[in-house]
Every structure is written in structure tokens, then in C-alpha cells.
Regions:
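Acidic, mature catalytic/reactive cores of soluble proteins
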Residues: 1-328
């Protein structure tokens, strides 16, 4: 994982090796293998499935930003929109199963807070070798796994050889109380619940019956992944500073609501009979503080804020050398 901002799209990153190799990453993969054999989303979902082949066997890794039953008031990302039956659990869950042979799995979690500026400080939670807390730049999250964890300076590491049929997991939690799956069964259940959430959502869509249906479904799921449920806003992209052309300077921070882009994306969902997101976005607009002449800005923060002052991070090398890296 090369990019993750928590607890929201526009929060400072904890993993940003997408923009600089030293700015934090999270690996959960076979030891010594850097390139997967296959990678795709579980059909009808935003659960990522990665298949790894090694000289000694095969494993399959699943990654999910998990969804669960609405727990009540959300103190992590406060809602201004009415709640739905499901809501974000504020955790990233990763599971692995050995399909064949024996495969050594490598867990390396090396966050670097505030866009690579602050290395993590780790402690074992309550002395438990299966739970470690990372803190920095005013943020804290918990890593929990059925692998034994060891602290190596600003990173945590775990290794284990999986036998055929054996499963393992790790979970990163920034939820209230740093709640995280207690065992692999719990982790798999949360991924399964997330799968059901996505399939239930896309099941409401009116998809055309032709050879582009799969691509349309995948596009709809991507758009839904760009919506911010607490306010109804949508972002143009979950990333910043990826150039329009290789090595170019047109590399903006798109983690905000651009009025034109959001209109097009929600029009696409409306055409598929997925109207709730469009309704929520209209309410988001209605809640915005107007300008002095009553007009709308071209963009807003996902919480409705108007001031999105831009800064640059000259200490980051940029995506494939594309600079500057822009924030805001």
C-alpha cells in the first residue's frame, strides 16, 4: 500500500511512497517477491484480491476498507447527513490464505505521518506482541495481527510461513477505541460483510445488457468509492500530485469537491438509477456557506470549507519525479 490518508480523503497521509519512497508504505506479501501474479477486484465490490505465486506455493491476499452496521454517532468523521444502515468501520483489513505449497509471508508496516515528515513511534499495546500502536503528528492508529510483531525503529515487522489452507491477517485501525479484529475469523467476517455491502449497493443499479456492462459496473463502484458519506461530498480523486503527463507540472491536489467533476460523476450514477448519492450531494451544496455574491466556488473541502490554501512539499521527490507535490 503506497497511499493512505486517515481518517478522511483530505487528511495528511500516513503512507505516501506513491510520492516519495521514504514517505511510508505497508507491505503484506510473500517474502522476497515484489510483483504479484494477478490483481483484480472481487466481482461487484471494491475488495481488492491479489494473487501471488512463489517458487514454493501460492497465496491470495484480500484488502478491504471495511464497512459494517451503523454503530451510532461517529466521532472520527462526524456526519451531517442522515446515517444509512452501513457505515465505515475506520479500518483497513488484510487477509491471506495459502492455496498451495508453503509460502513465507512478510508484514512490514512503516508509516510516516504528515506526508512523510514524521516517522512513526511504535509501542506494543499492553505488551501484546500481536498489537502495536503507532503515533505521530497528532495521530494514532493500531496494527493488529495473528502474526507476532516486532518493532524495528519506525516500522513494525512480522514473518510467518503459511502451510496449505492456513490463513493470516493484519488490520490497521483508527476507529474509536482503536477497535480491530481479534482473530482471523473476525477479520474474514468483516471482509465478507464489506463484500455484501458493495454487492447490495451495485445490485440497485440499472445496468445495460451488453459487453460494456462490466466496465460500467466497475466505473460505478469507483465513483461510489469517491463519495464521502458523512457529508455527501464527492472527490475528484483520492490522491494528490499525480501528473496529467509523465514528469509534468500539472499535478494538482484533487482530494476535494470540484463542482463540475462532481456534477458529471453523479449524473452518471443517476443514469444507473443510483440516486441516493445525487440527493446527498444536492444537500451538501445546500449546506455550503455562499460567497458574498451568492455564487459557488469551483471547489470545496469535503466538509464544506471554502479555504483550501495550496502549499508545496519540496522535500518529496514526486510521482516518478513530477514536482512540485501540492497540498491544498
Amino acid at each position: 500500500i503506497d497511499w493512505l490518508c486517515i481518517p478522511s480523503f483530505d487528511a495528511p497521509s500516513v503512507f505516501a511512497s506513491l510520492l516519495d519512497r521514504q514517505a511510508g508504505s505497508f507491505r503484506f506479501a510473500p517474502i522476497g517477491i515484489n510483483h504479484p501474479s494477478a490483481r483484480a477486484y472481487e466481482p461487484g465490490t471494491n475488495v481488492l484480491v491479489t494473487t501471488w505465486k512463489t517458487p514454493s506455493g501460492w497465496v491470495v491476499v484480500r484488502d478491504a476498507l471495511t464497512m459494517g452496521p451503523y454503530p451510532g454517532e461517529d466521532s472520527i468523521t462526524p456526519h451531517t447527513r442522515p446515517p444509512t444502515d452501513y457505515d465505515a468501520e475506520h479500518m483497513l483489513v488484510r487477509t491471506v490464505v495459502c492455496i498451495e505449497g508453503q509460502v513465507g509471508i512478510d508484514l512490514v508496516c512503516e508509516p510516516c505521518f504528515d506526508y512523510g515528515r514524521t516517522p512513526a513511534e511504535w509501542t506494543l499495546a499492553d505488551g501484546d506482541p500481536h498489537m502495536a500502536d503507532a503515533s505521530g503528528a497528532g495521530q494514532t492508529f493500531r496494527l493488529r495481527s495473528n502474526l507476532a510483531l516486532g518493532i524495528e525503529s519506525s516500522r513494525v515487522r512480522g514473518r510467518h510461513k503459511l502451510e496449505p489452507g492456513e490463513r493470516a491477517y493484519c488490520a490497521l485501525s483508527w476507529a474509536k477505541g482503536l477497535e480491530a479484529p481479534a482473530d482471523v475469523e473476525d477479520a474474514e467476517a468483516r471482509v465478507a460483510a464489506t463484500t455484501r455491502f458493495w454487492r447490495s449497493w451495485i445490485g440497485r443499479a440499472r445496468l445495460p445488457d451488453h459487453h460494456f456492462s462490466e466496465a460500467i459496473q466497475r466505473s460505478a463502484l469507483a465513483i461510489k468509492g469517491l463519495t464521502y458519506m458523512p457529508t455527501g461530498a464527492t472527490v475528484a480523486a483520492p490522491t494528490t500530485s499525480l501528473p496529467e503527463t509523465p514528469g509534468g507540472e500539472r499535478n494538482w491536489d484533487y482530494r476535494y469537491t470540484w463542482m463540475r467533476d462532481s456534477t458529471f460523476t453523479l449524473q452518471a450514477l443517476h443514469g444507473l438509477n443510483l440516486d441516493m448519492e445525487a440527493d446527498e450531494f444536492i444537500q451538501f451544496i445546500a449546506d455550503l456557506e455562499p460567497t458574498e455574491d451568492g455564487s459557488l466556488q469551483i471547489m470545496y473541502g469535503i466538509d464544506g470549507r471554502r479555504d483550501l490554501t495550496e502549499s508545496t512539499r519540496d522535500d518529496l521527490s514526486g510521482y516518478e519525479g513530477a514536482r512540485p507535490v501540492r497540498i491544498g
